[in-house]
Amino acid sequence: MDEEFQRVATKILAAEEAGNSPEAAALKASIEKNPSDHESRLHLAAVLAAQSQFEPAFQTLLESIQIDRAWNEQAARKRMVEYFTLAKEQPELVRRYRQALSTLLN
């Protein structure tokens, strides 16, 4: 698949998920109450990514991976890799979080 097409498709999916998710404050409250709430973490990352807030989105996904990397067939890891394409205009940020992800998985 063409890289630009993939980037646009990922952005649309993030926006759709963000539109169907509770607000960020409610998601953060849910995560604070239950740190293992991976579903809320995934939704929060989508909300943040849809707003081009990639660093907090990546951090949210890394935290989910730290808690349980296998959850939902590694959904957080897969989502993080997808969001790297959205943040391609911030190569240093992507490099840091790719490295952090690699370190966490190895």
Residues covered by each model-derived region:
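Structural motif corresponding to the intra-repeat A-B loop/turn of tetratricopeptide repeats
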Residues: 16-18, 51, 87
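Alpha-helical adaptor scaffolds
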Residues: 1-34
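Short coil turns that delineate tetratricopeptide repeat
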Residues: 35-36, 52, 69-71
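Structural register within alpha-helical repeat arrays
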Residues: 9-11, 44, 80, 101
